Amino acid sequence: MSSKEQEAQKGKQGWITPTVIPPEEWATFRYRGKTLEELLNMSMDEFIKLLPARQRRSLKRGLKPEHRKLLEKIRKAKRLAAQGKKVVIRTHCRDMIILPEMVGLTIHVYNGITYIPVFISPWHIGHYLGEFALTTKIVQHGEPGLKATRSSLHIAAK
C-alpha cells in the first residue's frame, strides 16, 4: 500500500471513529492564541469575541432556556465529580456551542435514535455538540443478490 493510500485509510478511520486526545497532551492546546487556562479565566464577553461569526452572533443573542438548563447540569456534574460521584449528562441540545467550562466532561448527545457519548476535549471548543453525534449512518452497500434489483425478481430462487 502506498503512503497516500495509508494516509487516506488513517483519515477514514479517524472520521468513522474519532481519536480522543489524552488530557496529558492538552498543554499544547491553543484557541486563537489562548491556552485552556486563559479561556477558563475569561469572562463570557471576552470569550465570545474569539469565536467565529456564526457562534459569536448566536451567543450574543443570549442562551436559550434549554442551553441554560444544560449549563446548570454541567456545573452540578462538576461539583459532584469533585466529591467523587459520577453523573451522566444527557441532552437533546445539539445546537449548544461547546464552551471552555465543558472541557473534560462526557456529554451524551441525542442523535434521533440513541444518546451518543461525546468526550469534550479543548479542540471541540467553539463547535456545536451536534457535530460530534452523527444522525445518519455511513452507507456501506452490500453485495447484489436476489431482490437487490428489479431484474433479479424474474430469476427463480433455488
From Swiss-Prot:
GO cellular component: cytosolic small ribosomal subunit
GO molecular function terms listed in the Swiss-Prot or TrEMBL record: rRNA binding; structural constituent of ribosome
Keyword rRNA-binding annotated: yes
GO BP term, pick one: ribosomal small subunit assembly
Gene3D superfamilies reported in the protein's UniProt record: 30s Ribosomal Protein S19, Chain A (3.30.860.10)
Sorted UniProt keywords: Ribonucleoprotein, Ribosomal protein, RNA-binding, rRNA-binding
Transmembrane segments: none
Similarity comment: family membership: Belongs to the universal ribosomal protein uS19 family.
Function: Protein S19 forms a complex with S13 that binds strongly to the 16S ribosomal RNA.
Protein's recorded name: Small ribosomal subunit protein uS19
Organism: Pyrobaculum aerophilum (strain ATCC 51768 / DSM 7523 / JCM 9630 / CIP 104966 / NBRC 100827 / IM2)
